[in-house]
Amino acid sequence: ISKGLVGSEMCIRDSSIYEPEANNTPDNFSLGEKASWDPSKYFVDDYEDVEIQTEDGVILSGWYMENDPSAITIIGMHGVTSSKFSPDVLLVGGMLYKQGFNYLTFDFRDHGTSTCEDSRHSAGQKEIYDVKASIDWLQNEKNIPTSNIGLYGASFGAMIGLMTPAITNDFQALAVVDSPFDFASLVREELVYQGFPGFLFEPVYHYALIFDQINLTEISPDDGLAASNKQPLIIFNGKQSPRVLAHHTDDLINAAENYGISTEVSRYDDLSHTEVMYAYPVEFELKLVNFFRSNINE
């Protein structure tokens, strides 16, 4: 069973992902197996190591890249078993920074070098409070108004971004890449992908409820959309992903329409999971930058 989906006995790291990325920094990172082209034009020399404390005492390890305190500021959120060292967030940070944005990215709890709280992720139930803490940090430490803040997430980070309005609407726009939309379906599909029967989700769910006192489906992306201020969404989806199936994006688009939320959608028949920024970097950057500039007022 995937450690990333149901937890592990150590902090959540897929060594095949984490170890090759562990030396990445905003000013020098590789794309690893994601792509073979040179990303050096997206390196950011001027960045700050930061620590952000959540309401429940978790310390989040992050990097902050600032152009101008009055500029649009985007929070970048990584995927499960990944970290702020991932090119999924560093490449996008470089794209945005070079276009004049500020950018904050951090390790979710139990990921990277943030506090190893309980060696498990909580399907976003706790991680949304990490996002809230990062928004509060930008306000309190960097004097960034919420009117200038947007969110970007890839995969698990995208799902958490969709869930965030259930506890705070202090941001103006959200960009998501290959987001899961229904966690229960995601786990069942992952179990099948790994060669296990899908019904094993039920004991996993009850284990978390009984032993960790966490309801893994208490807050869902749909709940986040329902509670939102109808912040506009830009949605990117590689339809060939074997892990987060294309129906999750179908469901997201339908839910956003039902709630009257404006969406921009780019779907790619030829791409797999979180590949768009590597396969079509110029197109991706242009769409992302124009979206945030159109929906966040500096």
Language model region names:
Residues L31-P69:
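N-terminal cap/lid segment of alpha/beta-hydrolase-fold proteins
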Residues M163-I214:
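Hydrolase active-site cap/lid region
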Residues D250-E298:
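C-terminal catalytic histidine-bearing segment of alpha/beta-hydrolase fold enzymes
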Residues V80-M95, F108, H247-H248:
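The serine-hydrolase catalytic nucleophile loop
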Residues S228-N229, I234-N237, S241:
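Short beta-strand/loop motif that positions the catalytic acidic residue
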Residues G93-T115:
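Conserved alpha/beta-hydrolase
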Residues H121-K142:
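Alpha/beta-hydrolase active-site loop
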Residues I1-G7, C11-I12:
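Single conserved hydrophobic/aromatic residue that forms the stacking wall/gate
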